[in-house]
């Protein structure tokens, strides 16, 4: 049987095995201008070396081990002969003063040494030299470092380097053999519920055909296990290599972890990591990733490979506690260790941004020119529309430019000049802007921002780790974001200006349809599964999340008995802006009171905004309060502890508890209050987003595209909030409860067409009939039990 061949580039090999030193986020990152200057410098140096200089020479060499072949490959910047001596040239462009460089960077030397060894296998010279050429990107001043090696010296060094890498590859192949063997008899861990088998077979078929599928399945079907199980089986069958379980909320990450744990209890061998936000993993009070401010950053790169290898080879599940334990043991940054470990595991559970966000994505998996046999499971996929728009949009605020210019005065005249140029360009746009102004493109501002980025990168490199003011560093990331998004501009974007709160203009690059950007990320893998309890209407979500025309779609109906819940629409009440006032608030408060008086228990009432909620709550408490009914309300910006305390009230309550909440907020999705913890949801209004610039731009954009712009900008996003809120009630087969939709608009065809199929038994009510109708329902439930 042929041995597997592992291919790795020279650069990736040396940067992985030979990384050393500190973590330091104070330096600049490569931007387009630096890359372009670097390429020009390479070509200039190569061009002036004469005809004897061979540029960009492709090299590769395969080393045989007992279990695997490792092929190292890459392109040497230059190869030339001087006085009969062969030299390998490695060129690096820097902003630093090259005359101050005392020695070459270790990984640069190592790259040249790898190329020297590979080249020597063909030519067999007695000696070979390596030259490290450093060039300043602005002045083009050069500095050379030269070293000579015998073939024996190079051979011993190269073999040691490769043996250190082979250790990782040998364990990886042994583990995969054990992993795949564990899946041969793996069965679905539960008795199939109604609809689950349909999802499992649909997902497996999708992966096997390398396509995408949209799964609309209500709460209670068991979507998490129904997507993870077939994905795991597909990996075992060689149809994929890594699973990425993507979520928008922490709670759904926990559910995914539990699903993998259950499969492991049934014999599965699978290494699963959960990527936790840096702020939640950091040992320090403030995430300052540099050796001066963080003990764990100091020498991190010297120790991280040993830390990762031990953790990888001794554990199979990597949650927050495990990561912190090993990071403490090895004195490394837990977040960076987590990212390094993710490369070697079978499944990654993480937020959307680690795959889709152009500023945060995992570059080892999704960087330019990289791809793999990845299976993407996208949970709560309805959230990806707005998250996608957010990730693929950017802006520059003239107020921020002026503040950055003021701060830069102490550091760089070049940066001040570049910022003033952008300021003048924005000021011109400001004069033409009233409410908002749509532009054909960003114009010269893109070039101006590129020059700002170049000056900031130069400054960061020249500072050699000295700190910039935090505000200036934040502006640096804002510029980087703007330039990243500027590269993506196409017909899916609207460029516009609007006036900021401080009276200064803001230029926005607004991604109205994120589908093409999402597609570019997903085509790095093999297959994608979008699933949610609220992907209605499915055509809307397919249009905004995918550009493919061959996507599958599955609609699974609720496994719960309709007779266990009552859905009523209040046809004599409205949340329209024109109707808001005491009379309507009183009617809504009366509806709430009559609902909770019908049966003792816990209820949630969902409002379109905090203001609306507070106005109705005031009327309710003044005119309908009762000693046996307790009210609690959601507040803006609740932290994790406050959220937990709010939810704990529903477990502890023995009387009647009414939770006043906001639609689309932290309590309207992703929470499980089963059984008697929640017996009713009262939903006030259709959830329409507030009218604003972005929503109006969306409406106009889709009207021009020939679809109903109001639906895309307002109705569909609003209805999603309604469906999510309604989904808080009835979480298991045994649950009973009521759902009240209080807005006359729900009786219209435009909204009825958006209801799930299982709402076919929905009835209408008025304030005069609601008590009787709900009373009849609860009486039937009592009689049945």
Predicted regions located by residue number:
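Conserved pre-motif I regulatory segment
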Residues: 174-216
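Mg2+/Mn2+-dependent nuclease catalytic core
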Residues: 61-155
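Signature of the SF2 helicase/ATPase Hel1-core->accessory helical subdomain module
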Residues: 227, 254, 328-347, 351-456, ...
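Metal-dependent nuclease catalytic cores that hydrolyze phosphodiester bonds in DNA/RNA
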Residues: 1-85, 110
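A substrate-engagement module of RecA-like helicase motors
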Residues: 186-187, 239-348, 356, 406, ...
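A contiguous, basic/glycine-rich beta-loop/short-helix subdomain that forms a polymer-engagement track
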Residues: 323-348, 359-366, 459-574, 579, ...
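Walker A/P-loop
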Residues: 208-230
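Conserved RecA-like P-loop NTPase helicase motor core
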Residues: 571-583, 635-746
């Amino acid at each position: 049987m042929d041995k597997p061949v592992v291919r790795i580039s020279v650069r990736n090999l040396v940067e992985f095995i030979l990384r050393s030193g500190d973590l330091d986020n104070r330096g600049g990152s490569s931007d387009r201008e630096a890359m372009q200057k670097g390429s020009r410098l390479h070509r200039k140096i190569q061009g002036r070396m004469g005809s004897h200089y061979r540029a960009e020479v492709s090299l590769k060499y395969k080393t045989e081990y007992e279990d695997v072949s490792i092929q190292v490959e890459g392109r040497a910047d230059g190869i030339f002969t001087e006085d009969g001596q062969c030299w390998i040239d490695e060129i690096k462009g820097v902003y630093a003063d090259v005359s101050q460089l005392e020695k070459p960077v270790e990984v640069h030397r190592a790259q040249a040494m790898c190329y020297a060894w590979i080249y020597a296998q063909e030519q067999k010279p007695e000696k070979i030299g390596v030259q490290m050429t450093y060039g300043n990107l602005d002045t083009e001043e050069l500095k050379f470092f030269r070293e000579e090696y015998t073939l024996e010296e190079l051979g011993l060094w190269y073999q040691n380097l490769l043996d250190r890498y082979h250790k990782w590859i040998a364990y990886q192949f042994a583990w995969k053999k054990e992993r795949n063997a564990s899946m041969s008899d793996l069965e679905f861990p539960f008795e199939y519920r109604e609809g689950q088998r349909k999802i499992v077979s649909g997902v497996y078929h999708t992966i096997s055909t390398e396509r995408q599928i949209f799964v609309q399945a209500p709460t209670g079907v068991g979507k998490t296990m129904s997507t993870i199980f077939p994905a795991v089986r597909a990996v075992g069958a060689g149809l994929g290599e890594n699973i990425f379980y993507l979520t928008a909320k922490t709670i759904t990450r926990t559910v995914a972890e539990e699903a993998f744990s259950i499969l492991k209890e049934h014999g599965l061998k699978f290494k699963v990591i959960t990527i936790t936000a840096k702020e939640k993993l950091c040992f320090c009070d403030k995430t300052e990733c540099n050796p001066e401010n963080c003990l764990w950053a100091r020498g991190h790169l010297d120790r991280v490979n040993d830390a990762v290898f031990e953790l990888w080879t001794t554990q199979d599940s990597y949650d927050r506690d495990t990561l912190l334990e090993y990071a403490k043991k090895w004195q490394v940054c837990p977040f960076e260790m987590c990212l390094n470990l993710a490369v070697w595991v079978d499944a990654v559970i993480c937020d959307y941004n680690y795959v889709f966000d152009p500023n945060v994505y995992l570059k080892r998996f999704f960087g330019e020119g990289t791809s793999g046999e990845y299976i993407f499971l996208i949970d709560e996929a309805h959230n990806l529309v707005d998250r996608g728009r957010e990730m693929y949009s950017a802006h520059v605020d003239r107020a921020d430019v002026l503040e950055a210019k003021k701060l830069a005065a102490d550091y760089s005249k070049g940066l001040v000049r570049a910022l003033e140029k952008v300021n003048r360009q924005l000021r011109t746009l400001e004069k033409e802007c009233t409410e908002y102004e749509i532009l054909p493109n960003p114009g010269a501002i893109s070039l101006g921002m590129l020059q700002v980025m170049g000056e900031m990168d130069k400054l960061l490199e020249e500072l050699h780790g000295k700190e910039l003011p935090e505000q200036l560093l934040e502006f640096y990331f804002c510029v980087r974001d703007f330039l990243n998004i500027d590269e993506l501009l196409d017909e899916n974007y609207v460029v516009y200006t609007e006036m900021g709160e401080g009276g200064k203009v803001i230029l926005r690059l607004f991604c109205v349809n994120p589908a093409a950007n999402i597609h570019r990320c997903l085509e790095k893998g093999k297959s994608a599964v979008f699933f949610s309890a609220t992907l209605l209407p499915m055509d809307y979500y397919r249009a905004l999340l995918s550009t493919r025309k061959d996507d599958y779609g599955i609609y699974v109906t609720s496994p719960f008995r309709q007779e266990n819940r009552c859905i009523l629409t209040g046809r004599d009440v409205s949340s329209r802006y024109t109707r808001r006032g005491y009379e309507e608030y009183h009617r809504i408060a009366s509806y709430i009171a009559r609902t909770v008086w019908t049966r003792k228990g816990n209820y949630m009432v969902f409002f379109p905004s905090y203001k609306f909620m507070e106005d109705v709550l005031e009327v309710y408490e003044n005119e309908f309060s009762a000693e046996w009914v307790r009210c609690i309300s959601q507040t803006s910006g609740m932290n994790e502890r406050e959220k937990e305390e709010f939810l704990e009230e529903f477990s502890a309550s023995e009387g009647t508890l009414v939770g006043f909440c906001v639609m689309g907020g932290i309590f309207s999705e992703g929470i499980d209050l089963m059984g008697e913890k929640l017996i009713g949801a009262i939903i006030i209004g259709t959830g329409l987003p507030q009218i604003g610039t972005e929503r109006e731009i969306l409406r106009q954009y889709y009207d021009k595209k020939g679809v109903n712009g109001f639906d895309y900008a307002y109705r569909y996003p609003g209805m999603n909030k309604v469906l999510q809120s309604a989904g808080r009630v009835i979480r298991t087969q045994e649950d009973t409860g009521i759902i009240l939709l209080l807005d006359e608009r729900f009786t219209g065809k435009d909204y009825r067409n958006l209801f799930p199929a299982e709402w076919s038994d929905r009835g209408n009510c008025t304030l005069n009939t609601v008590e009787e109708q709900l009373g009849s329902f609860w009486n039937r439930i009592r009689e049945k039990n």
